[in-house]
Amino acid sequence: MRRPSLALLALSSLPFGSARQPASFSIHQDLLAHPQFEVIFSDSYVFEADAFALLEAANKTPKPTPASDGAHDGSTTRTDLTSAIRESATANADTDNGDESIGGTSPLRETYELIAHPPMRYLCSIPIIAPPPALNKTATELAKAEEAREVTRAYNKGWELMRGLENQCLHFVSGWWSYQYCYGKSIVQYHAVPNPKGGPPLRDKNSQEYILGTSLPPSSHSQKGKQIEVPNNEQKQLSPPPNTELQAKDNQRYLVQRLDGGTICDLTGRPRTIEIQYHCNPALSGDRIGWIKEVTTCAYLMVIHTPRLCADVAFLPPKETKAHPITCRQIITSDEEALSFNQRRKNTIDSAAAAAAAVTTEDQKQGSESGSPEKLSYQGLTVAGIPIGARRILPSTHVLPLPRHLQQQRQEAQQGNLLEALTKAAFKADVFGDYGDDNNNNNNNHHPKAGKGRKAAGAGKGQSGQKEMKKMRISERDIDKLGLDQQTLDALREEIRAAGLDPDRNLNDEREAGGEIVWEFYADVSGDEDDGAVAEEGKEVFVWYEDEDEGGEPAEAGKDQKESKKGGNGEGSGSGSEEGSKEEYYRDEL
């Protein structure tokens, strides 16, 4: 188990030696952290008697060993324990480099420190690193000469490896533009059209193409600067391509080639130019263009990743610098505590194994459902306790809540107030249609058997025997707009039927000429004290009524439905008993 080394790096009083600085600057290197250390909390433990024995031997300071009833008998010798700790630290820190030293340096010996982290204590072994040998002037000059020879050798070897790209072309697509680069020739920018055969992108003959750069033929020069003509075979072996060099960045070398002679730029009046960089990428099986960018006006940069350069160790990516391990082991005072430690470790291992088995089972189940026997190797990324990208279904506790208006509609629907939910939602969305006379009555906007008298909405409140019935129509599009569905309307029919009414007479659905289904019903928008529905100022009351004979009293069905609206007075105040009288009803005031 690895943890940050903030607490233990305070041991700066130890005689650490300075390590060799890197050859070139890298933004990933901490220039002030040399040598580098990493704190590792081991899964093993050490008995208290052995821990103090190691501290005494390392510091050469006599310390009394505390006596404890359940202390270990000390049968393990100090030499064996020291060797075991050193071997474990080395194995945990460096398993890939074999015999190579960590960070380019080797530890001379180890010292021990006691770290108190209540209620636990740890014995930490800290390696002491040998300082690098001092370089004199002669050794520095020899090192520079050796480095220059290595650069020349890598430069020639690199271009020799890149000759395998001759007579090959690479393609790259970036948005509108496509690029074609033929090694040793030129790179062309053009707009591509789909290739029906599935091959490289085809050039659009109706658009213009641009040459970003052209390669010059390789040539060899005499000492006087005069060009010497040689056969092509010898020419390829003598010199690399012109306008090339070897560069290094982040401790990795790569080849650079500059091409000139491109299409004249309209903005600068000069030919287009491009710089090509060849980087070693051992993870690829073939050559590939990484990206192309226009760094300045009509000046481009292209990066090619190729495994060819990886054949030379000089172009390989730098190995990750590993820190020296500071290994800490928990101090145990008794055999009972050791048993408890081992049990906790076993439980941790079992829990991890069970979690891995559960993931494997889930992957197999998903693979069988999709018809693919492949298992998922990617376990996803856990963010705030939620696995992302691993085909996991979120539990209900992590599902985002519905918007407030949808929550209210769902609650009202679940409580059985379907009519109230429908009317409230309809008036909020302003989707109710107001359709004039009914076939059974000459009065506009009224239920044919609504009762004794009628009056306009908002004309008064609490007046008995006066009702305002509105014929409401909702289309399929309005249903979708309200967030309702056919199941909601079916439940509404059941509510009307439970109230002793006929849903086919109170909630009718018909298909219009355009093929759209429309639901229509009647609602009371005035209120009646006799029915227990009082129309307060600024309020509307909705009541279901059953058709009756002329002169009969309307029978209230279900609970009175209320809806808030803007306050307003109806303009039509004529008597509802007068046949043929027309009442005006303003929808904008609702």
Curated annotation (Swiss-Prot):
Disulfide bonds: C169-C182, C265-C298, C280-C310
Stretches the record annotates as Disordered: 83-106, 198-248, 357-376, 436-472, 545-590
One of the record's GO cellular component terms: endoplasmic reticulum lumen
InterPro entries according to UniProt: Man6P_isomerase_rcpt-bd_dom_sf, MRH_dom, OS-9-like, OS9-like_dom
Membrane topology: Peripheral membrane protein
Keywords: Disulfide bond, Endoplasmic reticulum, Glycoprotein, Lectin, Membrane, Signal
Residues of the MRH domain: 167-312
Domain of life: Eukaryota
Oligomer status and interactors: Interacts with missfolded ER lumenal proteins.
Family recorded in the similarity comment: Belongs to the OS-9 family.
Name the record gives this protein: Protein OS-9 homolog
Naturally occurring in which organism (per UniProt): Neurospora crassa (strain ATCC 24698 / 74-OR23-1A / CBS 708.71 / DSM 1257 / FGSC 987)
Gene: yos-9
